[in-house]
């Protein structure tokens, strides 16, 4: 109030506000805001139907999803973390008319790419979403997928992994199946930190340790399919190659004494 009126006249700040909003002083109301009085313009904005606003709401919501790397596909300018094949949008048993990523919404979605009995799944109502997808080998709820993963990991005994790795693995699968693999015990001669880093960061595996807290030659992986033997063999083969590389670089480092590396510090700027 005091910054808006001076000696009974509108200040430059208030005049600027009126001009910017195409208002006159007579259109303002004097209101009490806590311990002070303020001038305000009171107006009624005409309401709109929610269905007429949903297109914009969804577009804005999608843009706010934190995605580090986006990609384009097809001939349109839409961007997302992966190509979008279909858009399903239901409110109750009604389809919400939308067009996102160049796709018009409908009541159809897809189950698991390899395990589902049919390629296309129709939903009668939105309430059926989680239940129907489960019958087509997709656990739609993130928290439930993670519970399945943790239960599977715990069934094999002690394992190493933080919440960040659990979250990442949970986001990578639709139908989680926990399996156990192993590598040659000779690789245990590598520093445990090297083994754990290779398994967790590069392969998204969960290393295992024994009752004494020592790292073992076994590890746990979370697969998106149920073909156990082939999945385990493939993952063991990939890990073997990575551990061979790690062994080579570690042995190469051991060939140079620490004191011989001291002269290299002259090239380091602190």
Give the residues covered by each predicted segment.
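Long, basic N-terminal domains or extensions that often function
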Residues: 1-187, 195
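Hydrophobic alpha-helix position signal
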Residues: 18, 269-270
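Catalytic nucleotidyl-transfer cores of nucleotide-processing enzymes
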Residues: 161-269
């Amino acid at each position: 109030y005091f910054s808006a009126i001076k000696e009974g006249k509108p200040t430059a700040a208030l005049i600027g506000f009126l001009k910017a909003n195409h208002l006159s002083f007579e259109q303002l109301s004097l209101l009490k805001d806590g311990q002070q009085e303020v001038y305000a313009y009171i107006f009624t904005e005409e309401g709109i139907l929610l269905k007429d606003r949903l297109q914009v709401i969804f577009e804005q919501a999608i843009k706010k999803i934190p995605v580090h790397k986006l990609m384009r596909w097809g001939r349109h300018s839409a961007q997302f973390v992966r190509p979008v094949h279909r858009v399903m949008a239901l409110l109750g048993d009604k389809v919400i008319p939308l067009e996102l990523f160049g796709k018009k919404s409908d009541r159809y979605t897809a189950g698991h790419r390899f395990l589902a009995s049919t390629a296309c799944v129709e939903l009668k109502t939105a309430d059926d979403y989680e239940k129907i997808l489960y019958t087509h080998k997709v656990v739609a709820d993130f928290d439930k997928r993670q519970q399945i993963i943790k239960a599977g990991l715990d069934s094999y005994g002690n394992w190493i992994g933080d919440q960040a790795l659990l979250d990442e693995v949970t986001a990578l699968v639709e139908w989680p199946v926990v399996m156990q693999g192993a590598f040659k015990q000779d690789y245990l001669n590598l520093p445990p930190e090297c083994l754990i880093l290779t398994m967790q960061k590069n392969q998204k595996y969960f290393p295992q340790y024994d009752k004494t807290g020592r790292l073992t030659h076994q590890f746990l992986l979370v697969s998106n399919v149920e073909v156990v033997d082939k999945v385990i063999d493939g993952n063991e083969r990939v890990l073997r190659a990575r551990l061979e590389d790690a062994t080579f670089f570690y042995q190469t480092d051991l060939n140079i004494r620490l004191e011989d590396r001291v002269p290299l510090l002259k090239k380091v700027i602190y």
